[in-house]
From Swiss-Prot:
The gene is pepA. The active site is at residues 280, 354. It comes from Halorhodospira halophila (strain DSM 244 / SL1) (Ectothiorhodospira halophila (strain DSM 244 / SL1)). Keywords: Aminopeptidase, Cytoplasm, Hydrolase, Manganese, Metal-binding, Protease. Presumably involved in the processing and regular turnover of intracellular proteins. Catalyzes the removal of unsubstituted N-terminal amino acids from various peptides. GO terms for molecular function: manganese ion binding; metalloaminopeptidase activity. This is Probable cytosol aminopeptidase. It holds the Pfam family Peptidase_M17. It catalyses: Release of an N-terminal amino acid, Xaa-|-Yaa-, in which Xaa is preferably Leu, but may be other amino acids including Pro although not Arg or Lys, and Yaa may be Pro. Amino acid amides and methyl esters are also readily hydrolyzed, but rates on arylamides are exceedingly low; Release of an N-terminal amino acid, preferentially leucine, but not glutamic or aspartic acids.
Amino acid sequence: MELKTKSGDPARQRTACVVVGVYERRRMSEAARAVDAASDGYLSHLLRRGDLEGEAGQTLLLPDCPGVRTDRVLLVGCGRERDFNERTYRKAVTAAARALEQAGTGEAILFLPELPVRGRDVAWRVAATAEILETTLYRFDTYKSDPRPPRRPLRQATLAVPRRADLRRAQPALTLGQAAGRGANFSRDLGNTPANICTPGYLGEQAEALAQRFDGVRAEILGPAELEEQGLAALLAVARGAEAPPRLVVLHYRGADDDQAPVALVGKGITFDSGGISIKPSASMDEMKYDMSGAAAVFGAVHAAAEAQLPLNLVAVIPATENMPDGRATRPGDIIDSLDGQRIEVLNTDAEGRLVLADGLAYARRLEPSEVVDVATLTGAAIIGLGHHRHAVMGNAPGLVRDLLQAGERAADRGWELPLDEEYDEQLRSPFADVANIGGQPAGTITAGCFLQRFARGLRWAHLDIAGTAWKSGEHKGATGRPVPLLTHFLAGRAGWTL
């Protein structure tokens, strides 16, 4: 989708559709009042008649609004004016995007970014609108024999800002928001691709394609022989039962001087998780193709950083394998080595994500990053604790954790911090090895974080457990693209971009 910004009078726009907001109790936004004045009170008449109540997310398409130059006017409900906030704003933009696509307008000028949102400026509104337009209209029909795309999809949208002086701040915000949305959609494509296609080798191919697409991106792929030579024993231990060979995918993005230390992202890339010998129940096992959502999020963040041309250096490390049962597979009770040098007692082969991340973190340390953030669908306990709304966030650097949480607030992609106290770490003691890979049922998300912390020695490190947020089940089944928006805003902050 092509996105632009402008400033102007909604009644004077020559376009297929102008989008304006209407609150409850027949209260109109400034743009709606301008259209109402030009149409000799036409909107007021419709609102008095009850054609639109103004509830958040309601829409009403007017094909022949008198007195204006646009072909159509789309009214979007914004709820009660005094309660209008970030959540209501995003709901209104989402409803507008869907209504425009359904109407087949092809293009539109949205005056929603002119709406005042408590605590947020015009740059935030433009970035949020751009991201929502990209993600709301996402479709994944690659493997349907008759996909039937929209007859006239929304191909161009212009975001109107209140004053011409706002355009200077609106353009970089538009760039960042659209990059976050496109990065999230790229992540969703990877997550939704079935595991018979999205193998570790496929992720390597996607990395090479990303390097071909964007200047400043370079891909490095390590296969089984290189992994053995480099000593990534924990990753190889998880891969023993799989037919598909493992990979370590490394993406380098250079947007700053070479002497600037990179930010490192490490993404769990389990392209299918059967549980291994500790096999999972069959119900919903198809959703275990999403166990590479951490890797997909890291891919999406690199995509967003490269598209926005963020002025920072970034490295992404993705340990990728399947976790399958086989006569060669790692067994419960086995003791395995790791790149870090610590030996791990594997008490449960379905706690494999932390094993590949252990090697991923150790490999990232070799690249001398300024800080490391790992992303993983790591524990079902995260769903018990936080449901499907917030990511679990942990780390050994309070400032880094704070910045991630604040980025999540800006992006409406929120996290919640959990502790990593020593008492939790004690649950990982093993009588036979340096550490056990599970700490029992209590506080499973925290003990998983404690395990990773042992392999993040010497690093400023944070961990995002996205087990509850990476995909949806049921009627709207599919990858969400989270936490790409959070990561994009975090990286933008590290690059000196602020909204």
